[in-house]
């Protein structure tokens, strides 16, 4: 347990983290990924190169230091970290590596005059406190997944039963367990962890489950990203009949029980978890609005399916917006999703539940629009594909 003196030292470093936290964490990652190859599969190198991952962790460390006396306020952040760790199979033996590299980075970046032995001892104790909390929470999730019907721990082998192009950029993979045993149920909005060997190097990635749980198979729908190592591998080199290693479903961005109108607002590949949410919500009586934005019809995945669902369920309405329509495209609006368009498409009653996913600028825009249109902030839910970040309201 941290002493009062150690808490005071942690809080005293907050101004340094506010101005130099990102540089410190960048140095931390450079050290850890360079010297400990066993943890490299846990990290997406594209997120390292873009700075998104160091930025996200720097913000997390800062939040931890600011709330060192009120850790209960970090509950939502801890839940996201736990789910992300579980999806990639972060294990107790990984934590000492992180702690060693973090303390080295603090000393090497801040210097010995600031990062004294007392400061390092305080941060060492603070890190161990956080590590113990995460290890315990993650173990409870691992155990629950293993004990549930159809559940498992670690990796499970799946076969690609079907591979289907959904648009010019997105392809779906239908995955069935090789052992033929029942399959763990998941909540709409969750994702699975995928472990691959690409040219002799292990990599791990998360992909949203794009169809509701059915006990037989999982479906992921993957966008081919320019320069994306894993997405291009899946598109080009994984075929029907191939086998893949999966970790159990995880994630805290899930459809919540409610009888309020449901609004799903997506852009691009952000549509994938919303598809599972839509399927799950269909038996309910509440009105559903499905709003999807794409550049044009060629990259608009699942359009036919959405239209069929709307035709068969009177409580469902859909609206499509194309920012760069091609000749012959048909959409309800063109250009970016404006506040005026969104106002027309939302239910008149603003006491609704909104879930939105897509590129970060899109989500920031949607969040502002929903606030301007009177949708309560606590009823607006969103998720990042990749490291979490703040959305300016």
From Swiss-Prot:
Signal peptide: none annotated. The active site is at residues 95, 138. Binds 1 heme b (iron(II)-protoporphyrin IX) group per subunit. Binds 1 FAD per subunit. The record marks 29 as: Involved in heme-bound ligand stabilization and O-O bond activation. InterPro entries: Cbr1-like_FAD-bd_dom, FAD-bd_FR_type, FNR_nucleotide-bd, Globin, Globin-like_sf, Globin/Proto, Hmp, OxRdtase_FAD/NAD-bd. One of its GO terms (cellular component) is cytoplasm. Residues 150-393 are annotated as: Reductase. Keywords: Detoxification, FAD, Flavoprotein, Heme, Iron, Metal-binding, NAD, NADP, Oxidoreductase, Oxygen transport, Transport. The record marks 84, 383 as: Influences the redox potential of the prosthetic heme and FAD groups. NADP(+) binds at residues 268-273. Its EC number is 1.14.12.17. It catalyses: 2 nitric oxide + NADPH + 2 O2 = 2 nitrate + NADP(+) + H(+); 2 nitric oxide + NADH + 2 O2 = 2 nitrate + NAD(+) + H(+). Heme b binds at residue 85. Residues 153-256 form the FAD-binding FR-type domain. One of its GO terms (molecular function) is FAD binding. Its cofactor is heme b; FAD. The keyword Flavoprotein applies. Consists of two distinct domains; an N-terminal heme-containing oxygen-binding domain and a C-terminal reductase domain with binding sites for FAD and NAD(P)H. HAMAP family: Hmp. This is Flavohemoprotein. It comes from Pseudomonas aeruginosa (strain ATCC 15692 / DSM 22644 / CIP 104116 / JCM 14847 / LMG 12228 / 1C / PRS 101 / PAO1).
């Amino acid at each position: 347990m941290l002493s009062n003196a150690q808490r005071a030292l942690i809080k005293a470093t907050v101004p340094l983290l506010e101005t130099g936290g990102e540089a410190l964490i960048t140095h931390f990652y450079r050290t850890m990924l360079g010297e400990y190859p066993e943890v490299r599969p846990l990290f997406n190198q594209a997120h390292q190169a873009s700075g998104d991952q160091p930025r996200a962790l720097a913000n997390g460390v800062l939040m931890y230091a600011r709330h060192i006396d009120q850790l209960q306020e970090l509950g939502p952040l801890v839940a996201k970290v736990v789910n992300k760790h579980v999806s990639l199979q972060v294990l107790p033996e990984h934590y000492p590596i992180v702690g060693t590299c973090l303390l080295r980075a603090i000393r090497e970046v801040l210097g010995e005059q600031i990062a004294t032995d007392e400061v390092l001892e305080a941060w060492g104790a603070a890190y161990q406190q956080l590590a113990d909390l995460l290890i315990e929470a993650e173990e409870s999730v691992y155990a629950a997944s293993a004990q549930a019907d159809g559940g498992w721990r670690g990796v499970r082998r799946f076969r690609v039963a079907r591979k289907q192009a959904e648009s010019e950029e997105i392809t779906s993979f239908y995955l069935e367990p090789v052992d033929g045993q029942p399959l763990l149920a998941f909540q709409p909005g969750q994702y699975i962890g995928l472990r691959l060997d690409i040219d002799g190097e292990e990599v791990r990635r998360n992909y949203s489950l794009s169809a509701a749980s059915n006990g037989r198979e999982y479906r992921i729908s993957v966008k081919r990203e320019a320069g994306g190592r894993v997405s291009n591998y899946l598109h080009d080199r994984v075929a029907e009949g191939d086998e893949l290693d999966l970790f159990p479903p995880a994630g805290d961005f899930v459809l919540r029980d409610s009888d309020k109108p449901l609004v799903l607002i997506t852009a691009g590949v952000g549509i994938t978890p919303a598809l599972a949410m839509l399927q799950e919500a269909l038996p309910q009586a509440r009105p559903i609005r499905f709003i999807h934005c794409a550049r044009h019809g060629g990259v608009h995945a699942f359009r036919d399916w959405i239209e069929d669902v709307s035709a068969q369920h009177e409580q469902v309405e859909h609206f499509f917006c194309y920012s760069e329509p091609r000749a012959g495209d048909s959409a309800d609006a063109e250009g970016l999703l404006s506040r005026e368009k969104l106002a027309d498409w939302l239910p008149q009653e603003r006491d609704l539940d909104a879930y939105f996913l897509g590129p970060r600028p899109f989500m920031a825009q949607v969040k502002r629009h929903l606030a301007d249109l009177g949708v309560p902030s606590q009823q607006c839910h969103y998720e990042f594909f990749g490291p979490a970040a703040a959305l300016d309201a």
